Design a protein with these regions (language model features):
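Short, internal strand/loop/helix patches
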Residues: 36, 98, 105-146
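Conserved redox-active cysteine motifs that mediate thiol-disulfide chemistry
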Residues: 57-74
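Short amphipathic alpha-helix with an adjacent loop that forms part of the alpha/beta core around
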Residues: 44-48, 130-133
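Bacterial Sec-dependent N-terminal signal peptides
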Residues: 1-25
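N-terminal "domain-start" segment that seeds a small globular fold
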Residues: 20-46
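Short active-site neighborhood of thiol/selenol oxidoreductases, capturing the structured segment around
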Residues: 45-62
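Conserved helix-turn-beta segment immediately C-terminal to the redox Cys motif
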Residues: 69-94
Length: 147
């Protein structure tokens, strides 16, 4: 099971890195993201400092995103409390490119996305986070270390 999860995540990251112009260099600090969570609270990416974090750009209407969600749930369950050289634990910071709050919330519940860091400005492709990270397609994932 562990090998399947690692293999799948490797495929996801490889394809997405090849298909996009990432707006930062590997090893450089990432730009802060602060967006509203599903409970209307502000959540910052920097709140997760010290952990390995998967920044996940997705949307409820995106079929490939929804097909990818079960694998992210498996990875989260397996790695959430693990110790890593480059981080203490694993978290997912999900950034939705939805415009419809109800559809976004329903997708989180239906897909059983158990992590707590779900954020969106409900601006779709006009999202500041998507622009900052030069996201041109979804699903898009960026893995960052503890720093």
């Amino acid at each position: 099971m562990k090998k399947k999860i690692l293999f799948f995540l490797n495929i996801i990251f490889s394809i997405q890195l090849l298909s996009q112009n990432i707006s930062f260099n590997i090893g450089s600090p990432v730009t802060e993201i602060e967006l509203t969570g599903i409970n209307k609270e502000k959540i910052k990416l920097s709140d997760l400092r010290g952990k390995l974090v998967l920044i996940d750009f997705w949307a409820s209407w995106c079929k490939p995103c929804r097909r990818e969600n079960p694998n992210k749930v498996l990875a989260y369950k397996y790695y959430n409390n693990k110790e890593f050289v480059n981080g203490n634990g694993f978290e997912i910071f999900s950034i939705s490119l939805d415009k419809n709050s109800k559809a976004w919330n329903e997708a989180i519940k239906k897909d059983n996305l158990l992590w707590k860091n779900h954020v969106s400005d409900l601006k779709g492709w006009e999202s500041e986070a998507a622009k900052t990270y030069n996201i041109k397609s979804i699903p898009s994932n960026i893995l960052i270390d503890k720093n």
